[in-house]
């Protein structure tokens, strides 16, 4: 029996290479740092779309971005891996990326209806 259908979740190790995960991790930290600098120096408003925010209510004071182009591309790369392991034809909808820091907690929650099946990818940590 398909493990995803039986347990309603899967752990897939090495869904992407270490090198790609490390690249994505460092990209996102650099984007966070650049966005912080641009906010502090008034180059962009905290409300300018695409740069990210520290105002997500689920994990306050933690940098997050909805629909980052690189992460959307990564989602499409992981799609065939997810379809293979779930044995489902999946429709990608969106990405949401957070740079968790020590002490952050994401409490159990329900995602929006368009997110019937989610993928969480650990890209790295310090």
Where are these regions (language model features)?
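Non-heme Fe(II)/2-oxoglutarate
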Residues: 1-86
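Conserved active-site beta-strand element of glycosyltransferases/polysaccharide synthases
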Residues: 99
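Catalytic core of non-heme Fe(II) oxygenases with the double-stranded beta-helix
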Residues: 102-126
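Short hydrophobic alpha-helical module
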Residues: 84-88, 122-123
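A short coil-to-beta-strand element that immediately follows conserved catalytic motifs
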Residues: 87-96
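Conserved hydrophobic/aromatic beta-strand scaffold that supports enzyme active sites
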Residues: 9-11, 96, 118-122
